[in-house]
Amino acid sequence: MEVILMERVAKLGQMGDTVRVKDGYARNFLLPGGKALRATAANKARFDTQRAQLEARNLELKSEASAVAEKLDGQAFVIIRQAGETGHLYGSVSPRDIAEVVTAGGFSANRNQIVLASPIKSIGLHEVPVHLHPEVVATITVNVARSPAEAERQAAGEEVNVVEEATMDDLGLEVGAALADAGGSLGDR
């Protein structure tokens, strides 16, 4: 399906571009979100008459997003989660969780603006991009910890005590050493 982009869409094009996309992408994402119009003669004429208004609105939204990005960029947010001794979370931190914390911190963000390659599954400091506008990105720091005290230590730059996972080789050496200390070996039995 051919569509006319009403705003800049990442990896697709700029406002006013006519692009060919898959039908499902257009029907489920671009058209309902107001990001595109079907590329018909009537819609092309309508877009040409409204182009100046759309560009002005886009500039206004971009300037608002830039103002928010200046305040938001570099902010740190703390998320408390349960984790094992190795530092792996019992669940994960998703874009929805981060958006809730950012909103509670006094900023406006929804889960679609938070972009994670994969959910956060370990404690520590994580850099997370927030796409406030197609052309404006702010980076925040998400501090995932087991307790508020641990979060403060992580923020101060201290290394949190995380027990390293034991490998099978380590376990075999430990068992062998314990048997040697006991005076026996596996072959003696």
Curated annotation (Swiss-Prot):
Gene Ontology annotations for the cellular component aspect, listed alphabetically: ribonucleoprotein complex; ribosome
GO biological process, one term: translation
Keyword list, A-Z: Ribonucleoprotein, Ribosomal protein, RNA-binding, rRNA-binding
Domain of life: Bacteria
One Pfam family matching this protein: Ribosomal_L9_C
Database matches in PROSITE patterns: RIBOSOMAL_L9 (PS00651)
Keyword rRNA-binding assigned: yes
GO MF terms, alphabetically ordered: rRNA binding; structural constituent of ribosome
UniProt record similarity statement: Belongs to the bacterial ribosomal protein bL9 family.
Function: Binds to the 23S rRNA.
Record protein name field: Large ribosomal subunit protein bL9
